[in-house]
């Protein structure tokens, strides 16, 4: 009996010690995890936050722009002027001397000083999708660039040179922030929108499209987005794909996020328009969307441009594809005075303190994109020593 009592007491003591040990390990693990979260306290800033610079990847004769280079050059010069007057501008191009000769006579002295032309081979011009995505640390302001794989929107187009541009700019010390390798995951900048508070907006049409991250489920992709972008919440939109959009439904053509929990979106009031039903379904999804606290978002509806065609093909013209820079919004126009003016009016409601700068985007839309697609902003912050 004595032996049994001692054995039982020893067994109980052992069990208590084991539980205490497990509890201690859990506390240490949780503490370490918390410290790691604090150390890696990064977030994807909203586009309207202060920027360091914007990247353009200049068109050239060896791209699909060859048939109408003069028209697209004029548009790029207008974008460059608007940007370089307000912040630094990086231009990636395989032909630096040609770009300088074309651009510099059109720039003020201030804009020239703000412009850096970098030698970079390129397949195309869509900086939004091949440039790094920049995070900023919420505590110390340090920057981290995420280098994702760009594969020509699901292997539709050649992208080998474009996929190297960010790393080349980093190697040449033109981009100076720390760069994190995410080349095992396909993601384009035009596929995501951030509110700067931990919520990322995207579309299921794009991220679930073939030849991007094919073997992954939507839930798995969501977890990857949260991990890589340091996001707390992913909002998936399931409607709104524009006719002629070869990105498989980038969110920056249909829905944009603005300050004060405002969502700008492309509307359509013409029931005869082939895009009406899908855009209406998207509108209804946005109306049902709630913030984390249960409140509604402020919704502002942008007009739809009248249908634009090129050789019988409808082009994905949209007013949602604007660029926010320091102190200004650079927005596309389509030579449709009534719609262009209405778009500016709505944008001014979302950005009342910003100057509105109109840029004719008729040349860009011939290649199925617009101003936001052609640019990538780099947020202002500190570079890790």
Language model region names:
Residues 10-13, 21:
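Intrinsic-disorder-associated, low-complexity terminal segments enriched in Asp/Asn/His/Tyr and depleted
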Residues 37-385:
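The feature marks the mature, well-folded catalytic cores of soluble enzymes
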């Amino acid at each position: 009996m004595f032996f049994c009592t001692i054995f039982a007491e020893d067994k109980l003591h052992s069990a208590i010690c084991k539980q205490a040990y497990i509890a201690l390990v859990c506390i240490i693990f949780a503490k370490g995890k918390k410290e790691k979260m604090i150390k890696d306290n990064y977030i994807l800033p909203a586009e309207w936050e202060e920027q360091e610079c914007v990247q353009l990847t200049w068109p050239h004769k060896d791209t699909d722009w060859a048939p109408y280079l003069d028209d697209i050059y004029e548009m790029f010069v207008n974008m460059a002027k608007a940007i370089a007057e307000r912040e630094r501008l990086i231009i990636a191009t395989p032909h630096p001397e040609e770009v300088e000769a074309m651009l510099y006579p059109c720039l003020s002295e201030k804009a020239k000083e703000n412009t850096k032309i970098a030698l970079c081979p390129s397949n195309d011009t869509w900086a939004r999708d091949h440039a790094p995505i920049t995070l900023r640390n919420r505590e110390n302001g340090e920057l981290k660039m995420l280098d994702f794989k760009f594969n020509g929107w699901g292997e539709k187009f050649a992208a080998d040179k474009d996929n190297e541009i960010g790393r080349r700019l980093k190697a040449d010390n033109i981009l100076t922030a720390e760069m994190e390798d995410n080349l095992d995951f396909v993601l384009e900048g035009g596929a995501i929108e951030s509110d700067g508070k931990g919520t990322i907006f995207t579309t299921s049409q794009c991220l679930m499209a073939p030849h991007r991250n094919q073997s992954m489920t939507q839930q798995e992709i969501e977890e990857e987005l949260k991990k890589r972008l340091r996001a707390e919440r992913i909002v998936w939109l399931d409607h709104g794909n524009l006719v002629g959009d070869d990105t498989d439904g980038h969110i920056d053509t249909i829905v944009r996020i603005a300050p004060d929990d405002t969502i700008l979106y492309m509307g359509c009031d013409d029931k005869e328009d082939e895009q009406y039903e899908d855009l209406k379904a998207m509108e209804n999804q946005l109306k049902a969307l709630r913030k984390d606290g249960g409140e509604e978002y402020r919704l502002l509806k942008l007009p739809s441009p009248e249908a634009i065609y090129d050789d019988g093909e409808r082009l994905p013209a949209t007013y949602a594809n604007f660029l926010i820079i320091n102190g200004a919004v650079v927005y596309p126009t389509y030579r449709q005075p009534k719609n262009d003016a209405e778009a500016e009016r709505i944008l001014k409601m979302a950005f009342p303190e910003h100057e509105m700068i109109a840029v004719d985007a008729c040349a860009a839309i011939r290649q199925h994109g617009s101003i936001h697609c052609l640019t990538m902003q780099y947020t202002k912050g500190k570079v890790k020593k």
